[in-house]
Structure formats: structure tokens, C-alpha cells
Amino acid sequence: MIGTRVGGSGSTEIVQANQPQPSAAVAQAHPHAVSPSSNPPLTASQSAAQAPESSAAGAARLPVAPRHLPTLEKFRAEQPTVQGTSTPTISANAALLIGSLLQSEKLPFEVMAARLSPERYALQQFHGSDLQQMLGRFAEPGHLPGKAETEQLIKGFARSLADQLEHFQLMHDATAEAFGPGGLRDRNTLAVSQAALGEYAGRASKSIEAGLNHSLAVLDERIAALDSQLEGATEDSRPVLLMDRQALETARAMLSDLHVDFCKSPEAKRLSAVAAHTQMDALIDKLNVDRSSVGGWKGIGPIVAAAVPQFMVSMLHLGYIRTATSDAMKDAVPEKSADASMKRALAVGLTAGVAHEGVTNLLKPMVQAGFQKAGLNERLNMVPLKGIDTDSVIPDPFELKNDNGALVRKTPEEAAEDKAFVASERAVLNQKKVQVSSTHPLGEMIPYGAFGGGQAVRQMLNDFNLLNGQTLSARAVTSGIAGAISATTQTIAQLNSTYVDPRGRKIPVFTPDRANADLGKDLAKGLDLREPAVRTAFYSKAVSGVQSAALNGALPSVAVQPQGASGTLSAGNIMRNMALAATGSVSYLSTLYANQSVTAEAKALKEAGMGGATPMVARTETALSNIRHPDRASLPHTFQPDTLGGVPRAVENAYHMARGALQLPTQVVVDTVRVVEDGVASGVSSLRDAHKPAETSSPTADDAAAVELTAMEEGRRR
């Protein structure tokens, strides 16, 4: 329910497309039909109340609250269309009256709307519609409708339904805008109507897809039934059954294509967006309630849920595995060897990079599943946080608008302006979602500060002889603590992150993720090497690990006390050692984080129409774009171009260019490996096909049926 519902002035008329309800019953009613029949059975009095009745006759018996009788009189005096035209008017009274009716009697929204004015507010219903009847014909051999005709009817029904939903939402908006400073009781009444409209819109927006799914299920049942009949069919009945089965298979293929096409269509997207507008109040209330469940001291749960697994993975892959490998290579490769640096970088980088990806994707899902298994997610709120769905909070703008009480379609200029506004608001929200992550310039400072600061403190304590900070465990535990601090800081920032929509409503950007963990699926997401995306992630982390190790190895060694000397280092050497320890940690992480964000940046670049022309080198293309076009909108930005004369944005752009420079060497190698991998896989497949022996197996049942059907048809033609 953002401000983009209503644009400027326009003159295009909207003609309501209420389909007449056919009297013929449909053989199989859809189980999720958008109609009163999908609700609990109506009582006798309720059923009688649904009989067609004129507005004038029914208005006298409307059970509205006494305080709403003057509003009812105003509604009766309204004109349904703009004088002298067929353009519908938007009533500022109807929504309140529907809410009043719903407070007196619990009925579906569409029933109450029609009761208020059957001439004006007879809402679209899938059940009993021409569309449902046409879909029913797919299960009748010999009565298959045309694909183009069906597609046109589906999209026409969807457009008409979306127009009606927009009309009703604009009606509710008009009522809300008419309220004065008071009117709390009426606002509650309007909220009842708004909630009921959202519930109806949720059913209605899904009715077409559900109807298509239902028809596909019916076809599957019919085909299965024919298969059973064919098993015991006689020679006389078999040809007819085969023809019926072939007809149903053809119908199913066509219906499946229609289903896929509709789900991807602008009409389906518009229906989802309109439904999101009608459900916005309920969604925001739910998001705030969910956010309150981890508010205050309860926020310790999400903090622990983030800090504990991060402590474990950082201690293991950055601490023990990377440090142990580095120490082992120092002993194995002589310092004076000409290629010592390269050998160490390869060994340490490959090991640490693969460990970083593998350990993270192994331990984090296991720890979260463990929290759920122990019930800590319910008792102590130990749940992760997830970003809210941007499109649900900021849906696409309406195509219709309220033009001084008239329902008209926006002009192309108004529609383009509203879409641009929505895009800008989504960009703001998306920035907030990534602002504290390691893929954002500011977000990266959190782990840099935690890990760099942790290693600096460890080095300082070692140089002051307060502990032996050079042991494997000391360095590993420091990495673990730094990881926990980083995760804690990020979670606290997420718990306090809010987005203010154009209507001034505060919406939490992150919400608790209380979904039941599926450990098998969660592990497969990051560890199933059969998936190309998983392999690419490992390639990227391994190669970037080598690059990180090479950069880290180029740093000078820390100063140490001469052999046999006592006391501590000078203050200057201690400060130098602390700086080197911090720099070493940051130099190692910077390449990992830069390359970690390539996948998301490549996707955003493609969606913006600036990349993806050559899929095999998409990652290299992304790195180059970060160097050449750091100011593009698809990259995360904290500052606007005009903030403080553009200086902060220029610094941010330089940062993106540096990230691109770190990404480029790694991603060139990754893309090369992917090309080689695809070439090898293609070659092996071709070789296997070339040496595959000719098959002489008997035809399958489907093949036999097709042969018999063809022979039968040829016999008829003779």
C-alpha cells in the first residue's frame, strides 16, 4: 500500500469486466475456487442472503452499525459511474460499510460486497466462470479447446480480476484518506474490511494457477484410469481407449504449456502485486510482531545463533587449518628456495580456501539444526535472521488510479514514473539488507575490524610477554573470537535495521527465520559437488585463497627479541607488530570477501541489462565492470551521488574499483576452469555416445501403443 497506487490525472476510462455466471454446472469444481463455497458451509439464513437482490431492496435490511447509517445514506446517493460516461466511480463510503457488515456477521468479503451493492460489487469468481468451464473441456477427449483461445481467456480473466482488486483497494484508500484526526472506531472497522479484502485477494490471485493445477491433476487421473483399462481391454475396445489416451496426453501437454506461460506472464505478476498491496497492513503487522519476539533481551537468542557457529567455523578454517598448513609449509619449503613463496601460497591458499567454503557450509547448517533439535529455537529464540522479501513490502504500482473519485487507467508517463519510484524504493531497502554483510563496503569493515583488531591484540599480548600468542591454538582461538564478535555486531545491526515506507510506516528489514531446518537440503546447497554452482563456489574460494595467501606472504615478518635477550620489545616495534598482524588478517580476508560477492554481482549485472552476453566469462565480466563502472546502480552504495559534493560516493567508487582489481585475477582462472570443465564433460559425453552399442531392445509400452494407434488410423484412411 505504498504511495505509487495513485498517480496524476488521466482520462482513460475503465469498463468493468464482470463475467456473467453461466448457469451450466461444471463437472468438477475446483477445490480452491474463489467463491463462498470455499469457506465453511453457510447457514440457511446466510445462503438466503446471497440471492440476487437489487441495491435499493437490500439496503434497507443491511445490518450496519447505527453510527454508520448516515454513511449508508451517502452511499445510496452515490452514482456508480461518472455522469455521462461508463467510467466507474470510487466510493469513499463502501469500504467502511463492508467493514460494518463484517463486524455484524462473519461472511467472506465477496459476499458482503455483493450484499452492499450487487450491481456495482459482484466480484470475479473462478468457480462457475467461463474459464473454469473451458479448462474442464481439456479432460474431455474430442472437445479440446484451442491454445490461443484458452490463453486469451486466462489472461483476460486475470486482467479483469486485477482491475477489480485495484478498484477495491483504491476504495479502501479513499476511505482511509477521508478520516479526520479521530475516528478510531471507524479505523478499526475499516481495518476489518481491509483484512477481509486481503484474504479474498490472496485466494483470488491464486485461483487461476490453482485451477490449472487442478485440471492437470484431473488429466493425470484420467490417463491413469485409461492405463488401467488398457491392461484388460479387448481387441475391439483397445483402439478407442488408445485414441482417448493420446488425446488426453495432447491436452495435458498443451495445458502444461499454458500453465508455465501464465506463471511467467505479466498478468500473473500483476495479480501477485495487487494481492500484496491488499495484504500490506497485515504483512507489516506480522513483521513487527515477529520482530518484537526477538526484541530487547530476547535478541540474545539470534545473537548466539549467529555467533556460536561463526566462532566454530572461523576457529577451524581460518585458525587451525590455515595456520597449521602455513606452519607446515614453513618447515617443508626452505626459505632460500627460489619458488618458496609460490609453493607456500599454493599449498596454504588452496587448503584454506577449500576449507573456508567446506567448513562454513558444513558446520553452520549442522549447528542450526542442532539448535532446533534441542528446542533452543523456541525456548531461547536461537534462530537466524533473514531479510524481508522486497517485492512483498514494495509491490509493483497499480495500473489504475483514483482521479477525483473516478477509476481511470494511468497514462504511460504516470506508469513509468511510478515504476521508477518503486525501483528507487526497492534499491533503498535492498541497500539496508546488505549494508552489514561482507558484500557491502561498510559491512566489510565489521569483520576487518574484528579479525584485524583481534590479531593485533593477540600480537600485543605476546609482545608484552603476557601469553604465548604464537601457538597454533592461540591464533585459532583468536580467529574464533573475532568471528563471534563480527557475527554479533552484524546481528545487532540487523536487529535495529528498519525501513520507512512512503507512508511513514517503520518496517523491520530483518525477521526471525523460524522455518524448520532440513539438514540434508541445507548441506546439499553448499556441498553437493554435482551442482555447477557449488563447484564454481569452491573454485572461486580456492583460487582466491591462493591470491590471499600470496598477498599475505608479501608482508614483512614481525619483529622478535634476539635469541637469549630478556624484556620486551620497544614501543615502536610493538606498534609495528600490531599493525602487521592486523594488516595480514585484512589482506587475507579482502580477497576472499571481494570474490565471495561475484555471484550476486553477476546476477545483478545481468538483471540490469549490462552483463550476461557471454555466460562462460560472466564472472570475469563482472570484475571488469566493477573496475570500469563502479558507479552503476546494480552495485551496493551507501552514499548518493550528490551527498557532500559527491566526495563520499567517489571514495566508495574507488573502493569498488579496488575490489574489482582483486576479483579479476581469480575470476579469470575460475572462468577458465569452468570452460575446461564444460569442454571435458562435453567430450566425454560425445565419446560415450560414439561407442555406445546399437540398442535392439523391444519397444516400450508407449511405443507399442503409438504403433498400434498409427496402424489403426492408417487402416481407417484406407
UniProtKB/Swiss-Prot annotation:
UniProt KW Transferase keyword: no
Chain residue ranges for the region called Disordered: 1-63, 683-718
Biased composition (Low complexity): 44-60
Amino acid composition bias (Gly residues), ranges on this chain: 1-10
Predominant subcellular localization, coarse grouping: secreted
GO CC terms, sorted: extracellular region; host cell membrane; membrane
UniProt keyword Membrane present: yes
Keyword line: Host membrane, Membrane, Secreted, Virulence
Comp. bias (Polar residues): 11-22
Location(s), subcellular: Secreted; Host membrane
Function according to Swiss-Prot or TrEMBL: Involved in the suppression of basal resistance and promotion of disease symptoms in plants. May be involved in the inhibition of a host vesicle trafficking pathway.
SUBUNIT field: Interacts with the chaperone ShcM.
Protein known as: Effector protein hopM1
Organism: Pseudomonas syringae pv. syringae (strain B728a)
Lineage: Bacteria, Pseudomonadati, Pseudomonadota, Gammaproteobacteria, Pseudomonadales
